[in-house]
């Protein structure tokens, strides 16, 4: 599985810890905030990573900022992306299993590195069942997305 890990100025330290933690099991790419350009605002970083997930460059991604909220909002602006703010393993699992989230976000000022590692592991261990009972909900999310994102 190809996984992108990125953090803004507040999240880059935790993003590095997560990337190092995952490298033995996944094909991990660390995206630095300076790679995103445009003064490295978290919105630009989120856009770059979410767009790369959408085009298939990465299968999943983890975005980190101070709270996880800003990168989550920004990633969800990319049509077709489902990003979820996760600060516990149950939410990370459900993000993948119930919502087919491609991206999780977290706050470096909210959780510590060891908890963040368990959250990343929980998210990446799950696979969405396209024929499962949550598929209808995800299809409905996609329909709402298409309704408002007519490009």
UniProtKB/Swiss-Prot annotation:
Q: Where are the membrane-spanning stretches?
A: none
Q: What is the top EC class of this enzyme, as a single word?
A: isomerase
Give the E.C. number(s).
Answer: 5.3.1.34
Catalytic activity, per the record?
Answer: D-erythrulose 4-phosphate = D-erythrose 4-phosphate
Check the UniProt entry and state the signal peptide residues, or none.
none
Keyword set, alphabetical order: Carbohydrate metabolism, Isomerase
Which GO terms label this protein's molecular function in UniProt?
intramolecular oxidoreductase activity, interconverting aldoses and ketoses
Question: Could you provide one GO biological process annotation from this protein's UniProt record?
Answer: carbohydrate metabolic process
Q: Which Gene3D superfamilies match?
A: Sugar-phosphate isomerase, RpiB/LacA/LacB
KO phenotype (gene knockout): Cells lacking this gene do not grow on erythritol as sole carbon source, in contrast to wild-type.
**Annotated pathway, please?**
Carbohydrate metabolism; erythritol degradation
Q: Which sites are catalytic?
A: 65
Instruction: Specify the superkingdom.
Output: Bacteria
- Family membership: Belongs to the LacAB/RpiB family.
Q: Which NCBIfam families does the UniProt record give?
A: PRK05571.1 (NF004051), rpiB_lacA_lacB (TIGR00689)
Q: What does this protein do?
A: Catalyzes the isomerization of D-erythrulose-4P to D-erythrose-4P. Involved in the degradation pathway of erythritol, that allows B.abortus to grow on this compound as the sole carbon source.
Name of the protein? D-erythrulose-4-phosphate isomerase
Q: Which organism is it from?
A: Brucella abortus (strain 2308)
From the UniProt record, report the name of the gene that encodes this protein: eryI
């Amino acid at each position: 599985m190809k996984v992108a890990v990125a953090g803004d100025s507040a999240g880059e330290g935790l993003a590095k810890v997560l990337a190092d933690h995952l490298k033995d099991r996944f094909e991990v790419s660390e995206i630095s905030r300076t790679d995103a350009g445009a003064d490295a605002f978290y919105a630009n970083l989120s856009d770059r990573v979410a767009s790369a997930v959408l085009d298939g460059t990465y299968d999943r991604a983890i975005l980190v900022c101070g709270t996880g909220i800003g990168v989550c909002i920004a990633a969800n602006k990319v049509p077709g992306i489902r990003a979820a703010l996760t600060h516990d393993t149950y939410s990370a699992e459900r993000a993948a299993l119930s919502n087919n989230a491609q991206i999780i976000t977290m706050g470096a000022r909210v959780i510590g590195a060891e908890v963040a590692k368990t959250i990343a592991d929980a998210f990446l261990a799950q696979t969405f069942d396209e024929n499962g009972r949550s598929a209808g909900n995800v299809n409905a999310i996609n329909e709402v997305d298409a309704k408002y994102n007519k490009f």
